[in-house]
């Protein structure tokens, strides 16, 4: 015995869902049924002058079978089609949705059906409908990840179309700031890209040994930290960039301090020490420059550490 679902028994219902409801089609159906006068095929034409059937009775003879689905059945079909990725079929199913009388309100509130409509709107480029669905219906946390990704990607695509070029990381950051996630698909928790202290400590240890790890070392470190190789590579890349920037800043500060110290000592009539200073504390030009340089190195070394480690690693 071959089992067939109700959808397979009456496929024509999906192609003509509103055929009988259209006034033009209704008149065609009534006309094709005849009025019963002068036609031996009419069921009311027997015995002379029989009464013709009422219009709704004539119409019922030509109507296609009506299928009634509960919201749970519709949601089950939507979930299956969404999981399989058959977006085109999912869209056709939602467009020609046969529902039981009085079930429209429940259909419009069911999360699986609303999520399916959002998926179809996203894949068809109908971003206005997508935003309307996501902003006006509260979704559970299980659906947040997928819906957040669609929200952001839709805004990215609109921004790319408007600017006529692909978006970079900074552009995407600005888009996210301009179009924050609605609270209907977001629990309010701020996402952090900072790693745990244990992970950061392990990454720093490996960085001191080798700032340029090869792919095999990245995979090994990823397993040790629970990160992905891409995250490990990004952390090393960002750390190298911060260290280079800190080193360049240190060099500039050294040069500026050295030049200012030499200019102050070279000025005529400039005392090498104040009258309040004792001879033992009076410093020669060489001593003054060296002390200034030493103080600069101390300050900049602190700056280098804070600039490298105070930021979040992504």
UniProtKB/Swiss-Prot annotation:
Q: Which residues bind DNA?
A: 188-247
Phylogenetic placement of the source organism: Eukaryota, Metazoa, Chordata, Craniata, Vertebrata
Q: Compositional bias of type Polar residues: which residue ranges?
A: 298-314
> Into which family does the record put it?
Belongs to the SIX/Sine oculis homeobox family.
For the region Disordered, what residue ranges are annotated?
214-233, 240-314
A Pfam family hit: Homeodomain
Q: What is this protein called?
A: Homeobox protein SIX3
CDD domains for the chain: homeodomain
Source organism (scientific name): Gallus gallus
The molecular function GO annotations come to:
DNA binding; DNA-binding transcription activator activity, RNA polymerase II-specific; DNA-binding transcription factor activity, RNA polymerase II-specific; RNA polymerase II cis-regulatory region sequence-specific DNA binding
An example GO CC term for this entry is: nucleus
Tell me which Gene Ontology terms the entry assigns under biological process. Answer: apoptotic process involved in development; brain development; cell proliferation in forebrain; epithelial cell maturation; eye development; forebrain dorsal/ventral pattern formation; lens development in camera-type eye; lens fiber cell apoptotic process
TM helices/strands, residue ranges = none
Query: Where is it localised?
Result: Nucleus
Q: What is its main location?
A: nucleus
InterPro entries reported in the protein's UniProt record: HD, Homeodomain-like_sf, SIX1_SD
Q: Where is the composition biased (Low complexity)?
A: 271-293
Q: Which UniProt keywords apply?
A: Developmental protein, DNA-binding, Homeobox, Nucleus, Repressor, Transcription, Transcription regulation
What SUPFAM superfamilies has UniProt attached to this entry? Answer: Homeodomain-like (SSF46689)
Record function comment: Transcriptional regulator which can act as both a transcriptional repressor and activator by binding a ATTA homeodomain core recognition sequence on these target genes. During forebrain development represses WNT1 expression allowing zona limitans intrathalamica formation and thereby ensuring proper anterio-posterior patterning of the diencephalon and formation of the rostral diencephalon. Acts as a direct upstream activator of SHH expression in the rostral diencephalon ventral midline and that in turn SHH maintains its expression.
